[in-house]
Amino acid sequence: MIMNLEKLLDSTFNCECGRSHNVPIRELIYAEDALEQLPGVLSNLVDGRRVVLVADRRTEEIAGLRARQILEEARWSVHQIIVPDDGRGGPVCDDTTHIWLNDRMPSADIALAVGTGVVNDLTKWTAFDKDVPYAVFATAATMNGFTAANVAPIINGVKILIRAQAPSAVFAIPSIIVDAPFELTTAGLGDAVAKPISTADWIFNHLFCGESFCRYCSEIINSLEPYYLDRPGDIIDRKPDAIKALFNALLYSGIAMTIIGTSAPASGGEHLLSHTLDMMSSVDGALHDLHGRQVGLGTIFASALYERIFKIDKPVCHPYSDNIDSKFWGPLAGNVRREYKQKIPMLKIICEKLDDGKTWYPFLTNAQKLARPPAQIKSCLRTAGAAHTFAGIGCSRERLLTAALHMHQIRKRPTIIDLAWILGIMPSAAGEIIDRWLTD
């Protein structure tokens, strides 16, 4: 059982994991009059009345113009910045756009992001650099980053994770969240269904690599999962209770990442497929889908790997490469290599623990309780109208397979993808999993 969201906000508590957890987010306003509450809530957060409002051209129309009007009527000084699209359908969160925004953000008392993933991350990142608090007005239930202190930008072509700051407040209007473009909601569902797999990966890192683990954070959305995992038809029907549960699950996941200080509670090997597709697009200019929609496919893929791993009684380590595929990564090779090289010592430790046999069964016992089977995840996404095939994200089989065969190289933290390579399941399983689970 978890605390309700209101009690969790602006709290510090001692956890059974041995750590003291702090939730710096002070306000969550999920109400039809959330825009009207902006001036009063922001006044309680900061002393001054200068706000930088950041949006894109779509979210400006949805809520940005009205937010600016309400704040100015309440005698706030509003400086508005519209983040430009990159020519492929929307803005991107990368080092170039960050520099662009940083150069244009004036001195202010607080920054307000109006939008979803990219706008939220760029505002969070830039406000953190300028030592200014920020709040976010969410326009769709599209990802778990609203309440997270992390940002996942592309820097020098590589998708990485950096620490920034959590918002002081989150605002959302239920009718806007429910009626948001449906592909955005399905992106949020893709991010949410990843949680059981990412938690299994967290257990893997805890047992094999000594990473700290918090059961409270691992179970933080358990009571919400039935609303969308067991009743995905309610998502496609846009039932308010289901959409609210999905939005809350995303908020809780972000809070878990904030209080732990890493992305471990909500991001594991299942996210790497999406990150790799994004990185490939940054090189060749091909279009990619929304992060969460790609994560949905990555979650099915990782779940299918777990299904194979669970059948292994006595693990045997196979040779693994201590280098990356430089030809494939091209201009990104140097940065990818730096990440991968940092993982090699941990891969050696994993092999040592697999050889001694003492860690394998505790891992299986715990991970089997967590990981959902690929059939359940695929059924959930399909029934909800979310992407569950490579065609559904506008990707070819060849491109998806290429991403699957290289995704283990991009991050220094080991995941179930690395374990599948060590156990000899990869690379041969990649094409088989795509054909069985991600084709139709």
Model-derived features with residue positions:
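Gly/Ser/Thr-rich loops at beta-strand to alpha-helix junctions
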Residues: 32-35, 57-64, 115-120, 141-142, ...
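Solvent-exposed alpha-helices and their adjacent loops that cap or buttress functional pockets
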Residues: 20-22, 45-46, 103-106, 127, ...
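Active-site segments that bind and position negatively charged phosphate/pyrophosphate groups
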Residues: 220-368, 372-376
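A glycine/threonine-rich phosphate-anchoring loop and its flanking beta-alpha core
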Residues: 125-227
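ATP/NTP phosphate-donor binding region
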Residues: 1-110
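A short, small-residue-rich loop immediately preceding and capping a beta-strand
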Residues: 104-126, 130-140
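Non-transmembrane, aqueous-exposed alpha-helical and coiled segments at domain scale
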Residues: 89, 94-107, 141, 260, ...
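C-terminal charged capping/lid subdomain of soluble metabolic enzymes
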Residues: 2-15, 192, 308-440
